[in-house]
Structures are given as C-alpha cells and as structure tokens.
C-alpha cells in the first residue's frame, strides 16, 4: 500500500484522559551502594516530559494538528510543570483541578541509557471527578472532528459511555486507547486500539491469527465498535472490522530502543490522520510508521512530520531524489545539511528545455553540492506567459529536469513567484538567470537574512523557449 501523508493541519482533535508527568533523573553509576546491593547513581540531569494523554496531545501538535487537551490534575508543582510542558508546543490544557489528589508522576532513574527503577506518585481519581471532567469538556466536542480517550486506568475515564454517545451524535470520530479488561466501558467507540496483552486480558489467550480475528469481531459486535486495531509489537498491527477483510501491517521498526509512549504515538497518528481525511487503512499505516520511529528514541518522545516523511520514503524504497513534494524536499535538505552539503536553488517555467537551460543549470550546480529546481505549475505559467502556454504540462517538464545530471531535486509551486517556497526551504544559495538585480529576486531577502547568498547567472544569448516556439510557428 502506497502511503501518503495528509494535511495534518486540518485535523481538529480533543484528547481527554489520564495526564501525567514523566520525570527523568539521569546520571552515571560506577559503584554499588554499601547499604544495599544496588547501584549508586550520581544525578546530573533532570528532565520533565508530558506523559499519558498529555503525550498524545503533544504528538498531535508535533505532527501539525489542532489539539485540545482535558484531564485531571492536583493543585501542586507537578501540575505547573506539566502545564509548562504542553504549552511549549502551543497546547493550552483545560485541567480540572482535584485538590485532594496529586498530579500523577512517573519518575524514572536512568544510567547509561538504561532504566534502573521507576517510582510512581499517584492516587486514583474518583468517579465524581471523572464525570465532572466529562461535563466540563462537552462544549469542546462542537469544535473537533476526532475525540481521543487515553485511558491509563487512573480514574479520569471512569465510565465514558455517555460521553462517547454524545460525541458520536455530533459526528465526532471516537478513538480509544483502552486499559483493563472491561471493554464494555467504551461501548460505541469508532476505533479501539488495544495492544496484544490488553486484548488477551479481555478475550483470553489467542491461539493463532484466525482466533485473533474471530475474537476481535465478537468484541466489535458486542460493543458496537466500528473497528479494532490490535498492536502486536514485533508482529506489527492488525486492523479488524465487522465484515471487511482484516488488514495486517508488518512492523517497520529498525531498532527498538524504548517502548515508553509507543501506544500514545499510535493513537495520536491515527487521530491526526483521520482528522485530516485519511482512510482508516492509510491512517493505520501512518501510525505503524510513527511507532517504528518513536521506539528508536529514549523515553517519552514525539514524532515530527519530517521524520515520518523520511521513514515512509525509506520503507517505500524511494531514493529521496528526483521529483519530490515540499515535505519530502524539506527532509532531504535536512539530511543533506547533516552531511555538510551546500544546497543551491533556482526556479523557472522550463517549458521547452533547451541548451541554454542545460548550461545555466550546470553553472548553478557548480555553486554547491545539491541543486533544487522549483518549477511553475501549469496555471502559474499560463498567468505569466498567456494563453497557449505551457507547451508541456508540469509533470513532463519536471520529469525532463529530473533526468539532468546537474539536478538533484525538482519541486512544483503554484504561485506566480517562488517566494513562499524559498522562504520555507531557505537554501544556502539562491540563483537566478538573466538580467535581474539581486534585490529584485523573489525570496532573495529571506535567503540573505538567513545567512545564504543570492547570485545572478547569465543565460546563453539567442536561446529561449519563446524563440523556439516562434521558429516552429514560422516553419508551418
């Protein structure tokens, strides 16, 4: 299945559930305590990261989605640290403060990238607090397309059935990351995402693939779920619906470094993809890729759109060169700069490629290690050149350019000038051919402000697309 990323910024998601603070104490260890047979860790680094439902919200924000977050916290310093953590990515949380309970905290002690111990500071919230949270959050359902219930069995989602029904009645897709052995609590959800151990806690041991599918479909029927996605560690994921063939997606993780928060990443990628218009199958494939990225990181982490683009390109066998999207190009440029390569960019219509173009592009490539050619769309060329142009459609123009040895990447743009795309990409050098003045080149000021250079190269005299067209017309 060919996977393409949707416009994540279109997704509007409400995340409601058990929020917590993941705190890390990190330091070296070189001796055993004389008091007990345990290592002594000299702490030299302390880091706080949003966890649980808060990590789901951060993952959605990192991908570019619009996200609202609701959860239960205590009246303490930990709540302030958690608030600060989610605000770093523009998420304004809607907490319900429970004065007699602490904000849930998971403290992990690490040394040499290994977790030595985890200490949990928590008390389960009561059902009254949970129902108050649901009531406080009802109005938020009017402004979202997807609801994520992130359940860690800490009390924030005591009985969500009425809230799920209200969300579905408003046309909101409801995703649940479940906990515990009672899936009846999530009756009517659109999609539920148990891992294998959570699934078997409900249905008992699974003998084989057929048994898994049968038991999943029974749960779907009993609890009126639309679908179930069972995450299966090294075996990937399996998507089951009531009456369609199951879809198995193999794992894409190259290295498993830390599984902390992997489930959060899965459901956040699902929510953002579905909210942006992906099909369920596409959303599951995107979530699978995101999980493969995040398990290669230490601790509770997020996955960016650029990381997803790189992972998808790698798994789908794409070279990273030739005709690319803007997102693919942004990732490719990032990788090129990590290799110490200088990136040059130029732009134009390139309607009928001729010797003057080829000579110019060779000169441009000589100014760096990699050359980007941004190409005007068909509509843009028509606005600039008039009726009858372009002679060649943009796909054909880009294919010819991509075949030149001097050109590394070709990307289309639809505006009359390339200022927007240049401002986004900010190449090390921006090149234009002809008699332009540097100060008149679109995007030049932005490149210079970022520390880059802008240069003007000459075109070969007497050679142009217009003259070629005129010569052809004269011979007819």
From Swiss-Prot:
Q: Which GO terms describe its molecular function?
A: ATP binding; heptose 7-phosphate kinase activity; heptose-1-phosphate adenylyltransferase activity; phosphotransferase activity, alcohol group as acceptor
Q: What is its EC number?
A: 2.7.1.167, 2.7.7.70
Give UniProt keywords alphabetically.
ATP-binding, Carbohydrate metabolism, Kinase, Multifunctional enzyme, Nucleotide-binding, Nucleotidyltransferase, Transferase
Residues at the catalytic site: 264
Q: List the disulfide bonds.
A: none
Query: Region annotation Ribokinase: residue ranges?
Result: 1-319
User: Which GO BP terms apply?
Assistant: ADP-L-glycero-beta-D-manno-heptose biosynthetic process
Catalysed transformations (reactions): D-glycero-beta-D-manno-heptose 7-phosphate + ATP = D-glycero-beta-D-manno-heptose 1,7-bisphosphate + ADP + H(+); D-glycero-beta-D-manno-heptose 1-phosphate + ATP + H(+) = ADP-D-glycero-beta-D-manno-heptose + diphosphate
Task: Give the pathway.
Answer: Nucleotide-sugar biosynthesis; ADP-L-glycero-beta-D-manno-heptose biosynthesis; ADP-L-glycero-beta-D-manno-heptose from D-glycero-beta-D-manno-heptose 7-phosphate: step 1/4; Nucleotide-sugar biosynthesis; ADP-L-glycero-beta-D-manno-heptose biosynthesis; ADP-L-glycero-beta-D-manno-heptose from D-glycero-beta-D-manno-heptose 7-phosphate: step 3/4
List the GO cellular component terms.
cytosol
Main EC class the enzyme belongs to: transferase
- What positions does the entry give for ATP binding? 195-198
Annotated region Cytidylyltransferase: the residues are 345-476
Top-level taxonomic group? Bacteria
**Record's InterPro entries?**
Bifunc_HldE, Carboh/pur_kinase_PfkB_CS, Cyt_trans-like, PfkB_dom, RfaE_dom_I, RfaE_dom_II, Ribokinase-like, Rossmann-like_a/b/a_fold
Function, as annotated? Catalyzes the ADP transfer from ATP to D-glycero-beta-D-manno-heptose 1-phosphate, yielding ADP-D-glycero-beta-D-manno-heptose.
Task: Name the family the entry cites.
Answer: In the N-terminal section; belongs to the carbohydrate kinase PfkB family. In the C-terminal section; belongs to the cytidylyltransferase family.
Which proteins does it associate with, and in what oligomeric form? Answer: Homodimer.
Protein name, as recorded = Bifunctional protein HldE
